[in-house]
């Protein structure tokens, strides 16, 4: 974990790259991670009532194990969802990034792990690029060789049984399936997530910067589900605490040539569907950054 500023926390899902700056952005080597207002996040996950917090790189929904039917020691053992791969809008020469995933862990200020699998919609020097990947923090992310295109329907899941993690992603449109089983010594099972993210890039020394968020338009998640303490439910199940995340980029986190082309864009989730299993995340242009002059919210 890397503290940033007064109340921001980074849970790093590391992908090492040779340099930071324009070369990192143009290489297409990015990392995912969790940077959230710590005070807001901790308070939200400590109550059973829904809450909304602001993050510099997450948009979507997170559930924690402090709802009506769980205790602080409850563990989440699976998470899943479907989504439609969004098309990215790229300006000439633009390098920007967006990742979409389901995962377990990574939302706590003490977390050292995050188990996730998903897709990306990136702009690389003005050209759209789409990919699949998985990651078990603190290990580096791994690109999946199967192809994904805008409009494809993707189904993804993460399951953990003891020290074995099973990560699966299907392209239902192209009828391809990837499954990977890995050993993980200390998984984080304290939360489950359905996220659209502005990724970051790291160099070999571990120094990281957040990359500009790509204009992905809107992504629609459906059939979202998770399991905790043997109970299976949707995002809005009363057995766990629900938190919505709004994303507002923080230009101060960016550095060098990347910062010059960045603006404080963002993304926000819609309300959940009536069955608590579907929502959309919409990209938003030039959102005003939150006030950094006072105490953190919460």
Regions found by a protein language model. Give the residues of each.
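Bacterial N-terminal signal peptides
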Residues: 9-19
């Amino acid at each position: 974990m890397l503290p940033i500023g007064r109340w921001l926390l980074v849970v790093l899902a590391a992908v090492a790259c040779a340099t930071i700056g324009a070369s990192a952005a143009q290489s297409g080597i990015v990392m995912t991670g969790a940077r959230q207002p710590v005070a807001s996040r901790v308070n939200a996950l400590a109550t059973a009532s829904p809450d909304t917090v602001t993050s510099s790189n997450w948009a979507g929904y997170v559930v924690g194990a402090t709802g009506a039917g769980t205790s602080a020691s409850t563990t989440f053992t699976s998470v899943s969802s479907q989504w439609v791969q969004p098309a990215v809008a790229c300006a000439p020469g633009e390098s920007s990034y967006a990742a979409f995933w389901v995962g377990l862990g990574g939302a706590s200020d003490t977390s050292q792990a995050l188990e996730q699998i998903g897709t990306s919609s990136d702009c690389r020097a003005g050209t759209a690029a789409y990919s699949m990947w998985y990651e078990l923090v603190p290990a580096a992310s791994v690109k999946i060789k199967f192809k994904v295109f805008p409009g494809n329907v993707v189904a993804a899941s993460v399951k953990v049984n003891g020290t074995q993690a099973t990560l699966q992603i299907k392209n239902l449109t192209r009828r391809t399936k990837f499954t990977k089983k890995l050993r993980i010594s200390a998984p984080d099972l304290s939360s489950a997530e359905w996220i659209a993210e502005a990724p970051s890039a790291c160099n070999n020394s571990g120094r990281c910067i957040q990359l500009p968020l790509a204009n992905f338009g809107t992504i629609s998640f459906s059939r979202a589900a998770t399991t905790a303490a043997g109970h299976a439910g949707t995002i809005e199940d009363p057995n766990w605490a629900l938190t919505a995340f709004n994303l507002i980029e923080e230009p101060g986190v960016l550095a060098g040539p990347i910062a010059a082309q960045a603006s404080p864009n963002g993304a926000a989730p819609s309300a959940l569907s009536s069955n608590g299993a579907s929502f959309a995340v919409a990209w938003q242009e030039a959102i005003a950054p939150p006030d950094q002059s006072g105490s953190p919210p919460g």
